[in-house]
């Protein structure tokens, strides 16, 4: 299965029980910042934004004082899982980033999608990739 298929079929899909509700944008990105696959709506991000995210996975709390900057948008960092998941909120939307052995699974959402729904979609694929040794 191609990485693009994972994005299209497992991240940009309708959320279970909520037909028509889906993430705004999603991608699978290597730890080095290379994009493996992305939705057409996924924002272009800067290398320094990816560096900050990777630093936060290695040093949890690094982004909390400054916020999570991604694709030119600043998100307030909210409770995640140290070294495994970073979550950010901005207005009625937000971002979830799940770290696997080789990649970051990223999902961006706006209402009517809820933070919990975004977390579920992103983390389910991330957990699957971890189980596959990726």
UniProtKB/Swiss-Prot annotation:
<dbReference type="GO" id="GO:0005938">
    <property type="term" value="C:cell cortex"/>
</dbReference>
<dbReference type="Pfam" id="PF00235">
    <property type="entry name" value="Profilin"/>
</dbReference>
<keyword id="KW-1015">Disulfide bond</keyword>
<dbReference type="GO" id="GO:0003785">
    <property type="term" value="F:actin monomer binding"/>
</dbReference>
<dbReference type="InterPro" id="IPR036140">
    <property type="entry name" value="PFN_sf"/>
</dbReference>
<comment type="similarity">
    <text>Belongs to the profilin family.</text>
</comment>
<keyword id="KW-0963">Cytoplasm</keyword>
<feature type="disulfide bond">
    <location>
        <begin position="13"/>
        <end position="118"/>
    </location>
</feature>
<dbReference type="GO" id="GO:0005856">
    <property type="term" value="C:cytoskeleton"/>
</dbReference>
<feature type="short sequence motif" description="Involved in PIP2 interaction">
    <location>
        <begin position="84"/>
        <end position="100"/>
    </location>
</feature>
<keyword id="KW-0009">Actin-binding</keyword>
<protein>
    <recommendedName>
        <fullName>Profilin-4</fullName>
    </recommendedName>
</protein>
<dbReference type="InterPro" id="IPR005455">
    <property type="entry name" value="PFN_euk"/>
</dbReference>
<keyword id="KW-0206">Cytoskeleton</keyword>
<dbReference type="InterPro" id="IPR027310">
    <property type="entry name" value="Profilin_CS"/>
</dbReference>
<feature type="modified residue" description="Phosphothreonine">
    <location>
        <position position="114"/>
    </location>
</feature>
<comment type="function">
    <text>Binds to actin and affects the structure of the cytoskeleton. At high concentrations, profilin prevents the polymerization of actin, whereas it enhances it at low concentrations.</text>
</comment>
<keyword id="KW-0597">Phosphoprotein</keyword>
<dbReference type="InterPro" id="IPR048278">
    <property type="entry name" value="PFN"/>
</dbReference>
<keyword id="KW-0020">Allergen</keyword>
<comment type="subunit">
    <text>Occurs in many kinds of cells as a complex with monomeric actin in a 1:1 ratio.</text>
</comment>
